[in-house]
């Protein structure tokens, strides 16, 4: 609960739609309070005048170039290919989040850092959702995780191998693979940009700029939650050297580890066994609901070298290892289909007689104890991720007006899944207790040629004409697990489940490798018609070997109404091509039928499978978007900046899972006769379809004020707000049910607010940050829809969290910071878990040991304290 304040039940009464209805509606764009120079202006460049300020960065250390913490004259490289475009003169909203501000968030996960510094960015914490425990779905403007393009130094980053079935099958970049030590700043373009960058840039673009300077810096941080668990460590170092007079080499490394947390009660079935005298039940809880145990090590390199006066070689890359482990659902020692048969006696008896004698003895003499689990078991699920990337290129200028850049890139993510302290019940006394359940791998390769021409046309500035092409190849692979992780053993005939219990292994019928190629060409024109009026036009054509062709365009403009006030707006079309993984995913499991005489196969199959085609499955097409934004940026006072933008994003043909189908005997016979053996025994299935259309609209605003308080002191104040709402406009029959609709429209807060105050005096500083999230819904509490069908949801109210930190320079090069995240130990509402509508009416109580919601858009582990030591030479 929000103990010191009575604010958590506040409700917003003005809808996002109403705010977005008029021409003058405002939307808050998060211009970070620590915006800094993105790059030096090109030699000889003369950008249009922009407001500038003076100030200090977080931590009280002045910027090297004297730029202030809310510097609208900072040059940005995202959303434009003009080398002198500033934040103030940009035609689209851009956030620039500096390394110091990211460091003020104690979490070592980049997703958490961006969530607390960019209000329109959200990441969920999912303690019980298979791979999503470790690959957490992150969203920009409430859209799908893979509808945001991620770049490193302006080059496309490869995807994770994980396909997140909790987020409509999204396959996105894993931002947790990118360490703070390597980052100079993060630029977040919150506008459609597919016409400039290609697939995925529907919600926007996150461009991570790596450090490239000389010297060394680093940090060591330790912390723990107020509850006494979740101890965590984070350490990173960055070092840069000159390579003679022509180049530079910069290396970054980071190590992190974290112990698990538990915010749980004892499960009722375990408590009942304890009361009956079972001394083997784990206490205080058999199952932990909380954060996983984690370990990670990441290395980044960034280098440049001048080959001549007009040619430069550059390269950057990374390698990473991430491991995590968490509890799955508890299985009690009398669990049906695990230790006891669910078959009726007339079926069980004849089947039992066919078992080998060792299996019969095992079943008749306490199978739980003989398997090593007299108190039942809680499977421990883990994932090991190996990540690698490399980008290399050459760039230069053919003339003073023509720049060129030729590059190639490679990226891969390999995930291994394991489960232990479990069994394959169908193998009875011969079952292993730990399993390798399979692998997933995503590999991306690409090559780019980009040219930039400065065309003199007698305008305020030369017209910037950028054009180029891109070729890409993507490969998705599924590898098999241990045979015992997916096979059904002899005891399957008596109704005991096959496969590794808790997480079914990948079998040969699911494994495979799928690839696709794509080529693209683009033109991007940026013209300053006058000093105060600019226009941008971009177009891109792209062809995919498996998803057809698409052409997209963008028109943007900026109008300087006053010297300190710019209006801006953009209209664009966009797209996201389905990934090879989504187009070819096979995720099935096998278990005995209730009669024990046959095997049931259920799961997800590719939409192009002949079985899917029988039910309307076709090759997936790209999702298509239409994006409109309008806003302003202003600096009414020397130290005060304000920006606001309203947006609307319509997305058609969004990809989702179909309803579940079954085959009639006649359909099975026809498929078998046409050479489709997989139809044999397929009980039920679904597949991905381009099935629904949505509209997302909202408002982004930021206010930043750097207030001088004397010669050595100042107060940095910022307030940022995001209002965001998604509605389902239409859906194909059988694709979206009531529960899925709730997930699309209401799984995330429609409001996120961040307010921070940083007082700086000399080398000492104190930072207070407040984070508020609006209400949201999780599918847990049984209700019925208009048709009387049972659906599950529970509404959770707004929450506010306070963070406090203080730091000072111990020496010229060393700094100490101590702080508390979630200072007042606030927790969300407790979740209700009734199993029936009658239970809900009678008053729900926590059950199954879970106390807090399992799909929360913020942590539910309470407050934590930490200390951090940093150095900079």
Predicted regions and their residues:
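Gram-negative outer-membrane beta-barrel transporters
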Residues: 467, 641, 645-782
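N-terminal periplasmic accessory domains that precede
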Residues: 110-113, 117, 138-139, 174-176, ...
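Short acidic/polar hinge/loop motifs at secondary-structure boundaries
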Residues: 155-190
């Amino acid at each position: 609960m929000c103990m010191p304040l009575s604010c958590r039940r506040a409700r917003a009464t003005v809808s996002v739609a109403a705010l977005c209805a008029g021409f003058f509606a405002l939307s808050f764009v998060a211009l970070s309070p620590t915006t800094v120079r993105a790059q030096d202006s090109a030699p000889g460049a003369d950008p249009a005048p922009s407001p500038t300020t003076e100030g200090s960065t977080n931590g009280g250390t002045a910027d090297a170039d004297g730029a202030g913490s809310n510097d609208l004259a900072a040059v940005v490289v995202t959303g434009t290919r003009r080398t002198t475009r500033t934040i103030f003169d940009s035609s689209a909203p851009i956030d620039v989040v500096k390394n110091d501000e990211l460091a003020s968030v104690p979490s070592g996960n980049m997703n958490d850092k961006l969530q607390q510094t960019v209000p329109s960015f959200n990441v969920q914490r999912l303690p019980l959702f298979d791979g999503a425990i470790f690959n957490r779905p992150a969203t920009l403007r409430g859209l799908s995780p893979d509808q945001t393009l991620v770049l490193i130094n302006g080059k496309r980053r490869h995807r994770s191998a994980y396909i997140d079935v909790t987020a409509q099958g999204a396959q996105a970049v894993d931002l947790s693979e990118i360490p703070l030590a390597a980052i100079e700043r993060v630029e977040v373009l919150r506008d459609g940009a597919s016409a400039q960058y290609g697939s995925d840039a529907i919600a926007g673009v996150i461009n991570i700029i790596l450090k490239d300077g000389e010297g060394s810096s680093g940090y060591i941080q330790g912390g723990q939650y107020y509850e006494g668990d979740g101890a965590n460590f984070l350490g990173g170092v960055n070092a840069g050297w000159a390579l003679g007079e022509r180049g530079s080499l910069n290396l970054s490394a980071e190590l992190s580890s974290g112990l698990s947390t538990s915010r749980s009660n004892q499960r009722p079935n375990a408590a009942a066994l304890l009361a009956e005298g079972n001394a083997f039940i784990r206490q205080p809880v058999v199952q932990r609901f909380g954060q996983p145990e984690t370990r990670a090590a990441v290395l980044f390199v960034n280098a440049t070298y001048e080959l001549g006066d007009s040619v430069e070689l550059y390269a950057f890359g990374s390698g990473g290892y991430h491991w995590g482990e968490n509890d799955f659902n508890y299985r009690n020692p009398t669990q049906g289909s695990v230790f006891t048969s669910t078959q009726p006696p007339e079926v069980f008896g004849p089947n039992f007689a066919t078992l080998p004698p060792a299996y019969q003895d095992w079943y008749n003499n306490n199978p739980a104890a003989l398997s090593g689990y007299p108190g039942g078991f809680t499977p421990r699920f883990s994932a090991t991720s190996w990540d690698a990337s490399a980008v290399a290129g050459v760039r230069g200028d053919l003339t003073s007006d023509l720049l060129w850049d030729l590059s190639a890139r490679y990226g891969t993510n390999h995930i291994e899944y394991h489960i232990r302290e479990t069994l394959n019940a169908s193998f009875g006394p011969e079952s292993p207790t730990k399993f390798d359940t399979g692998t997933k791998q995503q590999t991306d390769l690409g090559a780019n040629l980009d040219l930039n021409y400065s065309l003199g046309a007698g305008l305020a500035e030369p017209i910037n004409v950028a054009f180029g092409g891109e070729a890409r190849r993507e490969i998705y692979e599924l590898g098999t697990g241990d045979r015992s992780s997916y096979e059904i053993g002899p005891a399957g005939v008596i109704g005991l489940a096959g496969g590794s219990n808790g997480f079914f292994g990948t079998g040969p019928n699911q494994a495979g490798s799928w690839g696709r190629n794509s080529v693209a060409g683009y033109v991007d024109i940026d013209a300053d018609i006058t000093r105060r009026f600019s226009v941008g036009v971009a177009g891109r054509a792209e062809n995919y070997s498996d998803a057809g062709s698409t052409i997209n365009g963008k028109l943007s403009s900026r109008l300087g109404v006053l010297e300190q006030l710019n209006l801006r707006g953009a209209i664009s079309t966009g797209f996201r091509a389905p990934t090879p993984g989504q187009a070819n995913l096979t995720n099935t499991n096998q278990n005995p039928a209730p009669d024990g005489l046959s095997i049931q196969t259920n799961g997800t199959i590719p939409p192009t499978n002949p079985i899917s085609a029988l039910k309307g499955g076709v090759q997936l097409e790209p999702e298509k978007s239409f994006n409109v934004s309008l806003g302003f940026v202003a600096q009414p006072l020397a130290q005060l900046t304000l920006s606001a933008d309203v947006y609307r994003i319509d997305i058609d043909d969004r990809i989702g899972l179909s309803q579940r189908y079954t085959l009639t005997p006649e359909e099975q016979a026809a498929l078998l006769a046409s050479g489709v053996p997989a139809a044999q025994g397929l009980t039920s299935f679904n597949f991905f379809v381009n099935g629904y259309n949505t509209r997302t609209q909202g408002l982004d605003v930021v206010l930043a004020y750097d207030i001088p308080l004397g010669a050595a002191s100042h107060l940095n104040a910022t307030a940022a707000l995001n209002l965001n709402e998604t509605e389902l406009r239409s859906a194909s029959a059988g694709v979206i049910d009531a529960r899925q609709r709730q997930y699309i429209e209401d799984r995330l807060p429609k409001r996120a607010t961040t307010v921070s105050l940083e007082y700086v005096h000399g080398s000492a500083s104190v930072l207070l940050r407040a984070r508020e999230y609006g209400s949201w819904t999780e599918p847990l509490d049984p209700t019925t829809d208009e048709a009387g069908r049972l659906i599950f949801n529970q509404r959770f109210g707004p929450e506010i969290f306070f963070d406090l930190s203080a730091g000072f320079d111990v020496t010229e090069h060393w700094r100490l910071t101590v702080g508390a995240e979630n200072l007042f130990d606030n927790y969300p509402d407790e979740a209700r878990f009734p199993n029936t509508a009658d239970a809900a009416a009678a008053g729900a109580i926590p059950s199954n040991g879970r106390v807090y919601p399992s799909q929360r858009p913020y942590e539910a582990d309470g407050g934590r304290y930490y200390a951090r030591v940093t150095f900079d030479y």
